[in-house]
Curated annotation (Swiss-Prot):
Organism ancestry: Bacteria, Pseudomonadati, Aquificota, Aquificia, Aquificales
Site annotation Plays an important role in substrate specificity: residues: H225
pH dependence of this protein's activity: Optimum pH is 7.4 for the THF-independent L-allothreonine aldolase activity. More than 95% of full activity remains at pH 8.4, although the activities are reduced to about 90% at pH 6.9 and about 75% at pH 5.9.
Keywords for this protein: Amino-acid biosynthesis, Cytoplasm, Lyase, One-carbon metabolism, Pyridoxal phosphate, Transferase
Protein name, as recorded: Serine hydroxymethyltransferase
Native species: Hydrogenobacter thermophilus (strain DSM 6534 / IAM 12695 / TK-6)
Gene name of this polypeptide: glyA
Length: 427
């Protein structure tokens, strides 16, 4: 980082402070993770300089022979990782991956059906504030009021009533296994396409610990970060029969030049996800989440759906009289990073919420296992049960710092920062 250190002190300091925050905080936001240094090196490479509109070997610019190699590798690795017939790795994000599928098969005003945002869905699955709910007629399915599991009977009834052209599977705050086969059965019964947004579960699917939607869905979209532990970006998988439509929808449909440095980083992440070590990582992510949920239940808290099959744990705080925002802020002071989150049938608005969402991907990347999850659950419980007690918050903060030092993050980067700090001290 010496070039940045010498060129832009303000940005350098912001990056160093963000590194220190990541190092000394328990990162429990379910959609966040820590990429490998190899992924970051690829993303920070000379490929950032190259424009490459079009597809590999069919570019609108010259000089693309080496970025073609990177994109070819990313495509083939994505296909192999998820057993897919076709992959487009150019979407800049999960949102743009979803948009590309919509644009490929829908017309404005067509009906789509996705999971209700307040029940665990995502903005791009038809929320009224999002393009998906503005351009298309969105209908929402949800979870059962008692079990908090997807209500497939309701989903079927709504599909029969509204005849959607596309049904969206997947979620951003649903901790359980989703029955992809059931979704396809319902989609077929009304002549709808099935698109699965596996963004949250992609790494678990790659690791073999969560069901793969590819055999069932017409289209599968995803991000490449979260459980997949790659750069912040997206991709699309589909059957060969839809390949041309998807490729044209991405470019020139919704994007111009792809980000070749990010595509190179995706290729690295896909290769990492093919390893036996990654399979063990995915298994540990789920094991950690299950222990976290179990400990919260022992501490007297209500866990939505009674547990988890994934990396997500959703706490319902209504019995505590606290809002998600209050708990998020209190935990933040104790160096524990979570996000406030709606729970099913939440009476509070999104800026407050009645719950918090936690996830285990980032802490598992740092090497933490079941014993650490038990400690983390107890520390979080201590803060919630003593909300507003600054002595308790400081005690927990010190415990967190000590734990984080036992599982260092990017030690090579830390050495470089310390070296540059010594140089700065001599100025």
């Amino acid at each position: 980082m010496r070039h940045l250190f010498n060129t832009d002190a303000e940005i350098y300091e912001a990056i160093v402070k963000e590194y220190e925050r990541q190092f000394y905080h328990l990162e429990l936001i379910a959609s966040e993770n820590f990429t490998s240094l190899a992924v970051m090196e690829a993303q920070g490479s000379v490929m950032t300089n190259k424009y490459a509109e079009g597809l590999p070997h069919k570019r609108y610019y010259g000089g693309c022979e080496f970025v073609d190699i990177a994109e070819d590798l990313a495509i083939e690795r994505a296909k192999a990782l998820f057993d897919a017939e076709h992959a487009n790795v150019q979407p800049h994000s999960g949102t743009q991956a979803n948009m590309a599928v919509y644009m490929a098969v829908l017309k404005p005003g067509d009906t789509i059906m996705g999971m209700d945002l307040s029940h665990g869905g995502h903005l791009t699955h038809g929320a009224k504030v999002n393009f998906s709910g503005k351009i298309y007629n969105a209908v929402y399915y949800g979870v059962h009021p008692e079990t908090h599991l997807i209500d497939y009977d309701q989903l079927y009834r709504l599909a029969k009533e509204h005849k959607p052209k596309l049904i969206v599977g997947g979620a951003s705050a649903y901790p359980r296994v989703i029955d992809w086969a059931k979704l396809r059965e319902i989609a077929d019964s009304v002549g709808a396409y099935l698109m699965v947004d596996m963004a949250h579960y992609a790494g678990l699917i790659a690791g073999g610990v969560y069901p793969n939607p590819v055999p069932y869905a017409h289209f599968v979209t995803s991000t490449t970060h979260k459980t997949l532990r790659g750069p912040r970006s997206g991709f699309i998988l589909c059957k060969k029969e839809f390949a041309k439509d998807i490729d044209k929808s991405v470019f020139p449909g919704i994007q111009g030049g792809p980000l070749m440095h990010v595509i190179a980083a995706k290729a690295v992440a896909f290769k990492e996800a093919m390893s036996q070590e990654f399979k063990e990582y995915a298994r540990q992510v789920v094991a950690n989440a299950r222990v976290l949920a179990e400990e919260f239940i022992k501490e007297g808290f209500k866990v939505v759906s009674g547990g988890t099959d994934s990396h997500i744990v959703l706490l319902d705080l209504r019995d505590t009289g606290l809002t998600g925002r209050e708990v998020e802020e209190a935990l933040g002071k104790a160096n524990i990073t979570v996000n406030k989150n709606a729970v099913p049938f939440d009476p509070l608005p999104p800026v407050k919420t009645s719950g918090i969402r936690l996830g285990t991907p980032a802490m598992t990347t740092r090497g933490m296992k079941e014993d650490q999850m038990r400690i983390i659950a107890r520390l979080i419980s201590k803060v919630i049960k003593n909300i507003g007690d600054e002595k308790v918050i400081e005690y927990v903060r010190q415990e967190v710092i000590e734990m984080c030092e036992q599982f260092p993050l990017y030690p090579e980067l830390r050495e470089e920062i310390n070296h540059l700090a010594k140089i700065k001290a001599t100025y």
